[in-house]
């Protein structure tokens, strides 16, 4: 009688605490081919980017270290750009090859600055953050273009704000306006009108229009007539006022040859031709005549 064979051991199921295997290191050479890591090349750990649209918190300075020298960097893209210099030196790219060719994908960039920005495409990092809204960018140039829409002077970190008596930007106003802009963005502000009045939150397409509007609240009249000294909030209004002194009437109606010294009265007059007096659109002929006489005298 044959002896019964013992039951095979039942393999134990892995527990949740068992560590997952570490991802392998990837060695990249100038033509982009992964190879077996020799001792004299750079080992770059694979970085998985799951969401390039999110804006993660920036890592601490010196989080990513170079394998060939003591240098440390805050961003993986900065480390890649630095290690590109080592690879270029070892492969002789600085003499016979292309020193601005990405050693990850082989893409040739116009120059070192473009190459530095190009490496962020591989890592998904967006290190250039807007201080006025949650958006972040991969390069400095698009950040500057974006901040200009907020009213930030190019090349500075200061917004175009009313100043104090010493000529310095008013930090309190900056804080108030920043809060208004953020609140408008959170509430779904009007598309195409990113600039909000800091007094009433009225949106505008251009920062210059917003500043002109804010003078209604502050009472500021920086444009003064050189003849009578009257002040105005906008230069265009001052130009129209100056025509009262010069007698210039450049706006002519093509239907009745009447002339006007400002475009506002000219547009009101034109509506009377197309809609007629008393139609509810614009002013009646009598109202227009009295308005024109009072402003053109």
From Swiss-Prot:
One of the Pfam families matching this protein, by short name: zf-C2H2
Keyword Nucleus among UniProt keywords: yes
UniProt keyword Transmembrane helix, yes or no: no
Chain positions of all zinc fingers (C2H2-type): 64-86, 100-122, 128-150, 195-217, 223-245, 251-273
Compartments (UniProt record): Nucleus
GO MF annotation, one: zinc ion binding
Residues the record lists as Phosphoserine modifications: 13
A single cellular component GO annotation: nucleus
GO biological process assignments: hematopoietic progenitor cell differentiation
Keyword entries, A-Z: DNA-binding, Metal-binding, Nucleus, Phosphoprotein, Repeat, Transcription, Transcription regulation, Zinc, Zinc-finger
UniProt similarity note: Belongs to the krueppel C2H2-type zinc-finger protein family.
Function per UniProt: May be involved in transcriptional regulation.
UniProt-recorded name of the protein: Zinc finger protein 784
Lineage of producing organism: Eukaryota, Metazoa, Chordata, Craniata, Vertebrata
């Amino acid at each position: 009688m044959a002896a019964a064979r013992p039951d095979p051991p039942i393999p134990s199921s892995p527990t949740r605490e068992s560590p997952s295997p570490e991802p392998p290191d990837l060695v990249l050479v100038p033509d982009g081919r992964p190879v077996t890591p020799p001792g004299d090349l750079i080992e770059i750990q694979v970085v998985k980017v799951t969401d390039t649209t999110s804006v993660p918190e920036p890592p601490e300075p010196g989080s990513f270290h170079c394998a060939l020298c003591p240098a440390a960097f805050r961003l993986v893209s900065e480390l890649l750009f630095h290690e590109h210099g080592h690879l270029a030196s070892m492969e002789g790219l600085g003499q016979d090859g292309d020193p601005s060719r990405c050693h990850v994908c082989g893409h040739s960039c116009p120059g070192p600055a473009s190459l530095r920005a190009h490496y962020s495409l591989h890592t998904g990092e967006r290190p250039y953050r807007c201080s006025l809204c949650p958006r972040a960018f991969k390069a400095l140039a698009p950040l500057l273009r974006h901040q200009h829409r907020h009213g930030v002077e190019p090349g500075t970190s200061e917004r175009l704000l009313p100043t104090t008596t010493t000529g310095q930007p008013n930090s309190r106003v900056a804080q108030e306006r920043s809060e208004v802009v953020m609140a408008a963005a959170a509430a779904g502000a009007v598309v195409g009108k990113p600039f909000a009045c800091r007094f009433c939150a009225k949106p505008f397409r251009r920062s210059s229009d917003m500043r002109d509007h804010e003078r209604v609240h502050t009472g500021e009249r920086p444009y003064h007539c050189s003849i009578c000294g009257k002040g105005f909030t906008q230069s265009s209004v001052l130009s129209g006022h100056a025509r009262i002194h010069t007698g210039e009437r450049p706006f002519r109606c093509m239907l009745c040859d009447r002339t006007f010294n400002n475009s506002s009265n000219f547009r009101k007059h034109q509506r009377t031709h197309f809609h007629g007096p008393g139609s509810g659109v614009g002013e009646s002929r009598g109202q227009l005549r009295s308005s024109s006489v009072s402003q053109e005298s």
